Structures are given as C-alpha cells and as structure tokens.
Amino acid sequence: LAGGSSNTGGAVRNRFFSVPELNELSQRINPETASPLQYYPLLKPGERFPINDPDLQPCLDPRPEDRVEFLHGLLESLSRIEAQGYCLLQQFGATPLTQVLTAGGGAKNEAWRSIRERYLKVPVRSSCQEQAAYGTAQLALQGTWPKSSSDCIRNLDVNRQ
C-alpha cells in the first residue's frame, strides 16, 4: 500500500537516502527492535489512504543525528501506516491477509521486509516480478478477466521458484 494507495512510500525514503546509503544503513537496523520515532512521512501535505485528509501535514520530527535511527523510524512508520491501511480494508470487508507479495525497490530491503512482517503479522515475500507496477498490473488483470486472473497470478508467482 505504501506508495500506491498512500502518499507515503519509496519516494519519501528516496528523498533522504541514496540507494547505496539505504542498503548500507539498512544492514545496521535490528528489525526486531521497535523504533520510538512516530513519523507520518509525506513529501507534501495531503494523504489519500488510510487517512483521507488533503491537508494532512508531513511529520518527520524529531530527526535524530544518527542516520540509522532516522531510517529505522522511517521504515517503522511506513510499515505502521501500511498495517493501518490493511486493517481499514478489513473493516470494509476485505479478506484478511495471509501473506504479502511485495515488488519494487523495497522488496530487496531485508530489514524493511522484517519490520513489515512484524506489523502485518503475516509473511512478506518478494514477488516474482521486481517492478513496482506489478501489483497495479495484477489489479488491472483481475478487473479485466476476474475468473481466470487468480490462476494466472498464482502461476506467475509459483513459476518464480
């Protein structure tokens, strides 16, 4: 949901960290330890989901001097917002999560994957496709051919192995 339904996500993360820095700092995060930082990381005011508020202000304070602590707080906050989104979807009648298949740059970040699992309480695995638009493509497929799309998607993910 981060970067898709929500205005939080990779773009916010990439504003503060280069890919090499992100990779190096992520290895120094203990994903089993919760960060005390409570951010709502937005690039500009306004959120769509899970909070529908066009005036919601970004919250990226306090900002620790230690870049590892800052990244840890950012990844924790993105994961918390993602969990809030899935919880809200379930309140509206969506099927409860059993696993999350993830794509895009964040799928390669082991620390973030572990943090997401802690918040979502389900396995988070990399999808067979690495492109960030993969989830959107799956939704489009289901909207176009709803009866055959589940088998197609399942086969794509199984063939990855």
Predicted segments, located by residue:
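Active-site core segments that coordinate phosphate-bearing ligands/cofactors
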Residues: 1-100, 108-160
